[in-house]
UniProtKB/Swiss-Prot annotation:
The gene is ycfL. One of its GO terms (biological process) is DNA damage response. It comes from Escherichia coli (strain K12). InterPro entries: DUF1425, YcfL-like_sf. It comes from the Bacteria. This is Uncharacterized protein YcfL.
Amino acid sequence: MRKGCFGLVSLVLLLLVGCRSHPEIPVNDEQSLVMESSLLAAGISAEKPFLSTSDIQPSASSTLYNERQEPVTVHYRFYWYDARGLEMHPLERPRSVTIPAHSAVTLYGSANFLGAHKVRLYLYL
């Protein structure tokens, strides 16, 4: 009887620990552009971010395209990574841009860190 109760309590605790994880979008290390599927449904496409390094600070740009007949507001954030692939903190604040109908907009971001070697752009509605 005691073994059965102990096993049941262990199972419940294991399930609760598994439920505690935060939902995340699975991302490959080489994936520099992450778009939520709702953007594609809204007629938005994007180019991978282009990373430019200079003596002053790294910067990145990416062009977004709106293929629809109405403007679409897109939220975005650039994530910066060091030479070892570690995310650099503090994170940039999320920003927004409204892309006019049948138009393109170029997003620009600058790393506030001298050691940034990689960038990832996250886009969502």
